[in-house]
């Protein structure tokens, strides 16, 4: 954008904050982030947020992701967005898919099949929030998690002129997706049987894409 001086200032500030965050909040003995300076308690939220936003150094991603995955859906439907973002970012697609398809009382499956809603709720269940509404956008995280992470469609330049297609299907045997972009829809079809997988991508005529073939989940 031409703001070179401002970009340098922001970059320097980020490096300082990042370093301070690691020094104050990461416990190398626990191998995870604590809830704050001076405490040994390390909750799910203290770890899923840095995992989702790319604030975990590479050498600790595996341990932090393992801890986050082990906690399950121990957060609100609002927090579920960042929890699953973090798992997919860390390559733990099997854990992410398990949460997306769960039928526990903290799941979208519970909303649909047990409660009977046809819209995303404000909370997992009325027992957790008696005054919740039955039409709440913050409860609809799968609407963006599935196309971005499971199907793997990401714009890589302004206006979706270029894309990256990097599916993370985990154990799904197949999926068919039609992902809208400002330049037209992207069709992604995937099927796997045993050790054989087939991936088909159809792009709008005014775009190009880099295709990244699915790799085995980290938690295999």
Q: For the regions a protein language model found, what residue spans apply to each?
A:
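Catalytic cores of carbohydrate-active enzymes
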Residues: 1-131
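Non-catalytic C-terminal accessory modules of carbohydrate-active enzymes
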Residues: 11-12, 16-19, 94-220
């Amino acid at each position: 954008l031409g703001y070179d001086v401002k970009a340098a200032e922001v970059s320097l500030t980020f490096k300082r904050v990042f370093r301070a965050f690691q020094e104050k909040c990461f416990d190398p003995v626990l191998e995870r982030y604590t809830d704050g300076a001076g405490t040994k308690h390390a909750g799910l939220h203290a770890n899923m947020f840095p995992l989702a936003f790319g604030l975990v150094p590479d050498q600790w991603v595996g341990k932090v992701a393992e801890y986050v995955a082990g906690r399950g859906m121990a957060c609100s439907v609002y927090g579920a967005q960042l929890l699953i973002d973090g798992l997919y970012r860390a390559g733990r697609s099997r854990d992410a898919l398990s949460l997306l398809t769960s039928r526990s009382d903290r799941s979208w499956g519970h909303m649909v099949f047990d409660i009977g809603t046809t819209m995303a709720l404000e909370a997992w269940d009325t027992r957790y929030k008696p005054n919740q509404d039955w039409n709440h956008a913050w409860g609809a995280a799968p609407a963006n998690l599935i196309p971005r992470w499971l199907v793997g469609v990401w714009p890589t330049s302004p206006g979706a002129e270029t894309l990256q297609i990097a599916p993370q299907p985990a154990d799904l045997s197949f999926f068919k997706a039609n992902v809208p972009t400002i330049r037209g829809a992207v069709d992604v079809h995937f099927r796997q049987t045993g050790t054989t997988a087939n991936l088909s991508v159809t792009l709008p005529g005014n775009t190009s894409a880099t295709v990244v073939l699915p790799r085995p989940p980290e938690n295999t």
